[in-house]
Amino acid sequence: AALVGMGSSIFHPESSRVARMASGGRHGLAQSIFQVGGNMGSAAGPLLAARLILPHGQRSIAWVSLLALLAMVILTGVGRWYRHQHQQPKKDTLQTDTHLPRGYVIRTLLVLVALMFSKFIYMASISSYLIFYLMHRFGIDTQAAQYHLFYFLFSVALGTLLGGPIGDRIGRRQVIWVSILGITPFTLALPYVGLDASVALTMITGFMLASAFPAMVVYGQELIPGKVGTISGLFFGIAFGLGGIGAAVIGQLADLWGIEAVYKLCSFLPLIGLLAFFLPELHKQKYLPH
């Protein structure tokens, strides 16, 4: 598990840089395409558990390792392309510094971190505990709950795929604002509705929340130009860390208070999206003095 974690920590920042290099200027679209691969893999997990592992046992997981071998072959080709790009003579590029004061940049990063806290803690409450919530509240079996989790994770993948290009078109700040604060009515309603409505609401929230992350990553890269790897590593590290810590804390609270009470508490997290008001429009701030 430690080796998998180390591999992931190396892979994601550098791959985010590769995606930006290959974007042709459509940075949000490239970031979405890069991220959606992981989301589709996460979505396939519950489906594989329901259709493969539960009927045939844990040994059937070995067949899934063939996909990892295929990914290694593909990454070999990507690595060759990346090396070739570095060997090319660098062209003169326009200065892309946003000219924002250092303190302003730090405050903006802190706002983004707070928004990521809201997003990933709430996502952890759904992705890690939706199965138990549905089984406890509605009495459905494990296999049916796995399918409902798949619907949520598929919506997350779809939101990731569309969030980047939408940000390219209408602005990343707008996507971040709407995708986090805009889900508040749905999260507040979730603990009080029936099974079908619960599934529908989790799909809507998954789609909207996921659309924020590609926009956040590219926004951060544009906030501090020339530090693509640093920003990518920071954001992916925070995302994975918050997801893991959030899942552990939510589990402890669920043991103390019950899963339904925890879902009611988590339903207020998207209100942190109000902080998106303090995110600057970078193109409007481009020529501010240091």
Write out the residue ranges for each language-model feature.
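A late C-terminal transmembrane helix in Major Facilitator Superfamily
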Residues: 225-257
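Flexible cytoplasmic inter-helical loops of multi-pass small-molecule transporters
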Residues: 77-101, 286-290
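Extracytoplasmic gate region of multi-pass secondary transporters
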Residues: 107-153, 157
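Cytoplasmic helix-loop-helix junction between adjacent transmembrane helices
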Residues: 1-37
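Helix-loop-helix hairpin linking two adjacent transmembrane segments in secondary transporters
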Residues: 34-83
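Structural signature of the two symmetry-related core transmembrane helices
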Residues: 174-188
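Small-residue (Gly/Pro/Ala) motifs that create kinks and tight helix-helix packing interfaces
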Residues: 41-53, 131, 246-254
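Helix-to-loop junctions at the C-terminal end of transmembrane segments
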Residues: 160-171, 254-255
